[in-house]
């Protein structure tokens, strides 16, 4: 029985969202126009796509918050700083998609939209960094690969941004799918028992 259980493929708690819904919807929106010449805010600024864009952002924001808090529970992480960053990141993303991106008609609102959308993944990355520091206390060696993957993802995002000179749809798709995959990877590590607390 134990051997059969070990052979089972890993299934994450939110695999339906992680593997299909969130990245799939992002890909659909990004594919409406060029991945490299525009971004989701511009693509979805027309009236027909605004509702879909808002629903996508709300879904993604809630998903990232719930998944991250689930990982916090697995890792027995209760520090307020990380939780506050997650709430703020999710709130920023949801607020961003609810603010219409109309730089010609409402330039100040457009600036706020861009700022909130930019800060959301940055704050989430900050929360995950605090979480990794906490769970690495038991054995940093065990989480070395998790740290490396985080730096690679962040370095890749920075490289895409510097190459393009602005936030394009490819970068948005990269960040969304990268975060989905990284959260699932952390869940797999924690559920294997590499956690400061085994009481979960």
Predicted segments with their positions:
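N-terminal topogenic module of multi-pass integral membrane proteins
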Residues: 1-77
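Transmembrane alpha-helical segments of multi-pass membrane proteins
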Residues: 80-94, 145-155
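Membrane-proximal helix-loop-helix units in multi-pass membrane proteins
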Residues: 89-146
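Hydrophobic cores of alpha-helical transmembrane segments in multi-pass inner/ER membrane proteins
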Residues: 17-25, 52-67, 119-130, 176-191
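Membrane-interface helix-boundary motifs at transmembrane edges
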Residues: 4-10, 69-83, 133-145, 192-199
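Terminal transmembrane helical module of multi-pass membrane proteins
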Residues: 133-200
């Amino acid at each position: 029985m134990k051997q059969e259980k070990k052979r089972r493929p890993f299934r994450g708690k939110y695999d339906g969202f992680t593997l299909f819904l969130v990245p799939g919807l992002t890909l659909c929106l990004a594919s409406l126009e060029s991945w490299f010449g525009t971004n989701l805010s511009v693509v979805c600024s027309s009236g027909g796509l605004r509702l879909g864009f808002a629903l996508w952002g709300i879904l993604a924001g809630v998903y990232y918050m719930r998944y991250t808090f689930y990982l916090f529970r697995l890792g027995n992480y209760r520090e307020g700083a990380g939780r506050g960053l997650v709430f703020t990141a999710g709130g920023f993303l949801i607020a961003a998609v609810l603010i219409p991106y109309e730089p010609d008609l409402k330039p100040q609102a457009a600036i706020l939209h861009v700022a909130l959308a930019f800060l959301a993944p940055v704050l989430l990355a900050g929360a995950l960094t605090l979480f990794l520091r906490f769970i690495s206390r038991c054995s940093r060696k065990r989480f070395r690969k998790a740290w490396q993957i985080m730096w690679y993802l962040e370095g890749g995002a920075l490289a895409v941004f510097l190459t393009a000179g602005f936030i394009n749809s490819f970068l948005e798709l990269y960040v969304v799918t990268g975060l989905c995959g990284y959260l699932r990877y952390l869940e797999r590590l924690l559920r294997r028992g590499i956690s400061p607390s085994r009481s979960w």
